Amino acid sequence: MLRVAVPNKGTLAEKAAQMLREAGYRQRTDPKDLVCRDDANNIEFFYLRPKDIATYVGSGDLDVGITGRDLLVDSGAPATEVVDLGFGQATFRFAARPEDIDTAQDLDGRRVATAYPGLVERHLAELGVKADVIRLDGAVENAIRLGLADVVADVVETGATLRQAGLVVFGEPLLRSSAVLVCRSAAQPHPQGELLLRRLHSVLVARRYVMLTYDVPADLLARASSLTPGIESPTVSRLHREGWVAVQAMVLRDDVHRIMDELYQVGARAILVTNIQACRL
């Protein structure tokens, strides 16, 4: 049975559970449950603190897990990113008082407060910068005001919290993070693990694409199908109406309205969009 670590709370937890449901797996119904068995799919889910997941997977106690890339790097665990799951995006940045520090090279000899000491120390080592990294569990923005640190390093989404504390970001991002599936670095392939990966890929494709169908005169098919080439090729069927065909093709969700506009200008009609629940390419 495949043993999978899943975040037990927060935005990663909600979106990870939703993705697993879309992939056809049973998930817990009570947020207090720590384990959920899906015997039909020969898989067992363990709900853990996101920060601990890479450690459990890296030790081999669990086979795979879903966590943030930032948490994976910070853990230093012997675990490897398998696939980016496309949610939980965040950027990890340095911040300080305005005009105090301009670049990461200016951190030499400074005090840096963060909840991600492993990530920060690794980044500074790559830059050849020596700084005093101070570990905090949260609310690092106050560390500068209270005199504990000169700089903070934290996940930044909008930057509003930093601005409220009178801080500004500087330098290049340390890391661009998102939710990822991880496995033990030296792990042997697991049949159920490979199936889980295929199913997650299926959900990712379904979220990225939609199915577009339309009717078009046969003499305009070449122009219309050039807008909708599909993955391999569009599906074309003759209609009862003489000289017309129906076309079906997958298109990128982000492009669908532009493509619909262009198809209509070409002469296509009855243009419909259908969401894809799952897809194997």
Swiss-Prot record:
It catalyses: 1-(5-phospho-beta-D-ribosyl)-ATP + diphosphate = 5-phospho-alpha-D-ribose 1-diphosphate + ATP. It is found in: Cytoplasm. Pathway: Amino-acid biosynthesis; L-histidine biosynthesis; L-histidine from 5-phospho-alpha-D-ribose 1-diphosphate: step 1/9. Keywords: Amino-acid biosynthesis, ATP-binding, Cytoplasm, Glycosyltransferase, Histidine biosynthesis, Magnesium, Metal-binding, Nucleotide-binding, Transferase. Its cofactor is Mg(2+). Belongs to the ATP phosphoribosyltransferase family. Long subfamily. This is ATP phosphoribosyltransferase. It comes from Salinispora tropica (strain ATCC BAA-916 / DSM 44818 / JCM 13857 / NBRC 105044 / CNB-440). The gene is hisG.
